């Protein structure tokens, strides 16, 4: 085999190995991004449920506060009469 043939073969093997390694690294990176996306979605769903629960509590507390204010206004109104 001539020297130039050996060089071309060596470069071809090197380029092929680099391409295969690059593809594997990119696949691993893509898989990790997919896993991270799923984890973020689950965390987002948990936060959404928590926010809905807190909103429900706030609505109940607001209704209780408004009822107490109404009672106080009625009590003050009956005292003035």
UniProtKB/Swiss-Prot annotation:
GO biological process: mitochondrial cytochrome c oxidase assembly
Record's protein name: Protein PET117 homolog, mitochondrial
Domain of life: Eukaryota
UniProt entry keywords in alphabetical sequence: Disease variant, Mitochondrion, Primary mitochondrial disease, Transit peptide
Subcellular location: Mitochondrion
Main location: mitochondrion
Any one of the GO CC terms: mitochondrion
Range of the transit peptide: 1-22
Similarity remark: Belongs to the PET117 family.
Disease cited in the entry: Mitochondrial complex IV deficiency, nuclear type 19: An autosomal recessive mitochondrial disorder with onset in infancy or early childhood. MC4DN19 is characterized by global developmental delay, impaired intellectual development, developmental regression, loss of acquired motor and language skills, and motor dysfunction. Patient tissues show decreased levels and activity of mitochondrial respiratory complex IV.
Keyword Mitochondrion belongs to the record: yes
Pfam families to which the protein is assigned, alphabetical: PET117
């Amino acid at each position: 085999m001539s020297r130039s043939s050996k060089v071309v073969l060596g470069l071809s093997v090197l380029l092929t190995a680099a391409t295969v390694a690059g593809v594997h690294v990119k696949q691993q990176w893509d898989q990790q991004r997919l896993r991270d996306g799923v984890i973020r979605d689950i965390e987002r769903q948990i936060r959404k449920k928590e926010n809905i629960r807190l909103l429900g509590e706030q609505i109940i507390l607001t209704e209780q506060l408004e009822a107490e204010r109404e009672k106080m206004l009625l009590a003050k109104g009956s005292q003035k009469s």
